[in-house]
């Protein structure tokens, strides 16, 4: 039955590989179950309700990706978009979280329409192959940087923005030990991959977690919640109380629009739409490139199904009570493990569903255990750099700017924007536009990106 649904042989994979890949993707994404409630609760939402909504929205979106597109991509409420939801729309602009959910819901409806009319697919296909390769590399650096941050190997610095962790001081027994365990995890994962151990990334996560548990038992690792370092020893395994979901479920339809200008609402909604659109396209480009899923013209077969899954998941997430649900770049970890079909994403989706019951267990997976997986995935995604013609400055410079912008601006969509603007303008000014037959959509995107920087 699985063969008939997911076409495993056609995609040169098997059930074991797909399931291992799905588990790996989930393990690298599980942090969203802890982080999303923490961020959205700042807007006044109930954190327990958001946790359940996060798990259910992730299940719905990822299962739809498996069934509609047969791709190994997983979805969950997006980082960055959740921060914009709480800290900008609610806390800074002063809108209610119900109104913010309505903006997310409307954005999802618009995306469904755009997906049905091939607009999103057209944008994907209009982006030149050079930029698609650059997006893959940029996402690799972005993911690795996130991994370094999660491991506390890179921390904030007043003088240089960021700096490496200093392995001394009062927080050494928590932050310092966690960072060291993350480094050990990178080495362990690398050795497993060099030895071609199936599931090496997943085993790396589990081994690092076990080392953390042993260190905590021995008193070497000391939890410090003030520093974001929590106990890694599970104190409970299951929870069957889902009543909290009622505090957010359906609240989107109880939005009070009194005192809210229509232009202000659409400005908020457009911001969600813009970031979600290009984060999703960027992730699809990057992960699909890594998995060699793009055809010779740089197009992604069945992309309409993937975009539809993303759109419906956003609407479902808003109804359940969470910010924009989008395709996760951590899907690359499962692809690196050999995931090639929807069985990978279905496995991930089922684990998110189970997380509503086993949330106490999953929430104890420390960030220093999943960080090595993200760092290693970053390495694998660098392979697309060989597809970029750096000997041609009209191709190489926009590609370089795309790669540079993603980790430094901490945004996939900003990297795409910089890449599209620079690629179009450089080729237009140098007279290469006709030679390269630039798609009219690229001109439209360039204008839209410039307007975005001017007015938003």
Model-derived segments and their meaning:
Residues 1-49, 165-168, 205, 209-303, ...:
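Helix-loop-helix hairpins and the membrane-proximal interhelical loops
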Residues 12, 16, 184, 266-270, ...:
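Alpha-helical membrane-protein architecture signal
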Residues 44-63:
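Loop-to-helix transition at the N-terminal end of transmembrane alpha-helices
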Residues 58-79, 110:
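Juxtamembrane transmembrane-helix boundary signature
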């Amino acid at each position: 039955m699985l063969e008939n649904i997911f076409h495993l042989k056609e995609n040169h994979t098997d059930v074991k590989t797909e399931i291992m890949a799905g588990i790996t993707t989930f393990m690298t994404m599980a942090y969203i179950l802890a982080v999303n409630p923490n961020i959205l609760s700042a807007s006044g939402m109930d954190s327990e309700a958001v946790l359940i909504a996060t798990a259910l929205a992730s299940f719905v979106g990822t299962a739809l990706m498996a069934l509609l597109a047969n791709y190994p991509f997983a979805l969950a409420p997006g980082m960055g978009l959740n921060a914009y939801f709480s800290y900008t729309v609610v806390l800074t602009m002063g809108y209610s979280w119900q109104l913010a959910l309505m903006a997310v819901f409307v954005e999802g409806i618009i995306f469904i329409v755009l997906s049905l009319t091939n607009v999103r697919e057209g944008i994907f296909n209009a982006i030149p192959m050079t930029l698609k390769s650059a997006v893959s590399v940029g996402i690799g650096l972005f993911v690795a940087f996130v991994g370094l941050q999660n491991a506390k190997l890179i921390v904030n610095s007043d003088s240089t923005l960021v700096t490496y962790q200093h392995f001394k001081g009062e927080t050494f027994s928590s932050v310092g030990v966690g960072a060291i365990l993350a480094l050990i995890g990178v080495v362990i994962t690398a050795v497993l991959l060099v030895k071609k151990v199936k599931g090496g990334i997943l085993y790396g996560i589990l081994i690092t977690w076990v080392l953390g548990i042993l260190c905590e038992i021995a008193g070497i690792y000391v939890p410090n919640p003030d520093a974001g370092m929590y106990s890694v020893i599970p104190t409970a395994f299951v929870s069957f109380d889902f009543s909290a979901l009622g505090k957010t479920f359906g609240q989107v339809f109880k939005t009070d629009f009194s005192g809210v200008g229509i232009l202000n609402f659409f400005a908020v909604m457009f911001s969600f739409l813009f970031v979600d659109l290009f984060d999703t396209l960027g992730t699809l480009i990057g992960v699909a490139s890594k998995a060699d899923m793009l055809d010779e013209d740089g197009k992604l077969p069945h992309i309409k199904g993937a975009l539809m899954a993303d759109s419906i998941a956003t609407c479902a997430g808003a109804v359940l009570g969470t910010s924009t649900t989008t395709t996760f770049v951590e899907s690359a970890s499962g692809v690196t493990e050999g995931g090639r079909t929807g069985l990978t994403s279905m496995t991930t989706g089922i684990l998110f569903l189970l997380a509503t019951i086993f949330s106490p267990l999953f929430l104890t997976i420390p960030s220093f255990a999943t960080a090595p997986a993200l760092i290693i995935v970053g390495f694998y995604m660098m392979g697309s750099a060989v597809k970029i013609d750096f000997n041609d400055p009209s191709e190489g410079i926009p590609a370089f700017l795309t790669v540079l912008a993603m980790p430094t601006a901490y945004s996939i969509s900003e990297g795409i924007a910089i890449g599209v603007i620079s690629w179009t303008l450089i080729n237009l000014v140098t007279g290469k536009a006709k030679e390269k037959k630039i798609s009219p959509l690229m001109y439209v995107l360039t204008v839209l990106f410039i307007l975005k920087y001017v007015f938003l």
